[in-house]
Amino acid sequence: LAIPDTLCRMDWWYRLEFNSPVPTEGREAWLVFKGINYQAEIWLNDVCLGTMKGAFIRGEFNATDHLVDGKNTLVVRILPPPNPGIPHEQSPSAGNGMNGGQLCLDGPTFISSEGWDWVPGIRDRNIGIWQDVHLRFTNGIRLHDTQVVTHLALPDTTVAEITVRTEVENLQPIAKQVSVDLNLEGKKVTQEVNLAPKERKTVVFTPDVHKTLELKSPRLW
């Protein structure tokens, strides 16, 4: 059975019907895509919420005004990569072909899926939805891109110093005072943050300020 290479040169459509409540006043709804390869258009109830480009980019789309009470229809259009390459199993006898790097021209993606000297080409180039999709509700405040950094004074591994960063966003048109709580091994630390309307701030928890973040006898990987 020959699998055609045209699979990576055409659009693909995903369609899902789901039931959801409509956000109440002061709340928001977000459609979150953890990973799509390589380009996509996102449609909810016949409204285009936006686009995504890049296999390792997350997409978050405000669905607050587009959800209906009851059945909703989510449609995702996957567009083919601009430079899909040509599958060609390289060997001393077959010579070199346009594989093993052509997908890099588009940006970070699964570059070996076009074929290499150690793998045959994947005919659809692994395009499609490859990570989870969520519908998330917020209550006027949203956290973004939380990062945890661990420092060990190697070769000593008896204490780990942990630094946590996160972005806090006020989605409301009024000022907000927000408590950001961090729970580590059952111990909680808190920072109070004042946010102007629609403001976004970086909050950092460091072991210099919060001694709880000096973790003794850490469980090493």
PLM segments and residue spans:
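Secreted/periplasmic carbohydrate-active enzymes, especially glycoside hydrolases
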Residues: L1-W221
